[in-house]
């Protein structure tokens, strides 16, 4: 297939659908914009990865100490898209309202992604998978995670919270990411 005109500004993924550059030591990530409905490329364009959805088999399982968890049933190479952390996209006031209504026994799955855009401005996206979500809600925290969360934009400026393999992941390994937004506890 020919080269998509969307890729003239840089390529997000390699020929194996792996995130091209997780950054220096996996600490940072560049913004990812995938082809969208306005793009003339085919559905097979290599700049369409997250929008294709799950490509691996997973299992929700009961962990020994953390409640439910998610593990892969097959090998996942470093850089591959694993799953989206999907849920309701909320405004800040709704996030505050929901947190205020929670009791100490309620779980909180709301995640805040802060992106530094320009002139010191910060763009925030809040996602709550409590009522509407997918398998991403079963991911547990780890200070040594095997996933990295990257905001990916497709047909909207509201990003999809995409989780990519930060390292090669073997079958039966529990999938995890750092809830703080850091990777491997590096600042």
Task: Show where each model-derived region lies.
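Accessory low-complexity/Zn-finger-associated flanking regions
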Residues: 1-68, 181, 187
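Active-site-adjacent structural elements in folded domains
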Residues: 19-21, 158-161
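Catalytic cores of histone-lysine modification enzymes
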Residues: 27-28, 33, 37, 48-153, ...
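A generic structural signal for residues embedded in beta-strands
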Residues: 84, 176-177
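Active-site pocket scaffolds in enzymes
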Residues: 148, 155-157, 179
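Short glycine/serine/proline-enriched coil/turn segments at secondary-structure junctions
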Residues: 157, 184-185
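Exposed beta-sheet edge/beta-hairpin loop segments within beta-rich domains
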Residues: 163-169
């Amino acid at each position: 297939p020919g080269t998509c005109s969307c890729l003239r500004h840089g390529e997000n993924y390699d020929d194996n659908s792996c995130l091209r550059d997780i950054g220096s030591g996996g600490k940072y990530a560049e913004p990812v914009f995938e082809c969208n409905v306005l793009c003339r490329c085919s559905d097979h364009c290599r700049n369409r990865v997250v929008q294709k959805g799950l490509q691996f088999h997973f299992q929700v399982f009961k962990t020994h100490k953390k409640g439910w968890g998610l593990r892969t049933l097959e090998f996942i190479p470093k850089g591959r898209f694993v799953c989206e952390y999907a849920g309701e996209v909320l405004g800040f006031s709704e996030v505050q309202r929901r947190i205020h209504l929670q009791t100490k026994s309620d779980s909180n799955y709301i995640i805040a992604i802060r992106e530094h855009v320009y002139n010191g401005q910060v763009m925030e996206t809040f996602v709550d998978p409590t009522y509407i979500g997918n398998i991403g809600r079963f991911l547990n925290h780890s200070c040594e995670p095997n996933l990295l969360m990257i905001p990916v934009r497709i047909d909207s400026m509201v990003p999809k919270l995409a989780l990519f393999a930060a390292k090669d992941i073997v079958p039966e390994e529990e999938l995890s990411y750092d809830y703080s937004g850091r990777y491997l506890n590096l600042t």
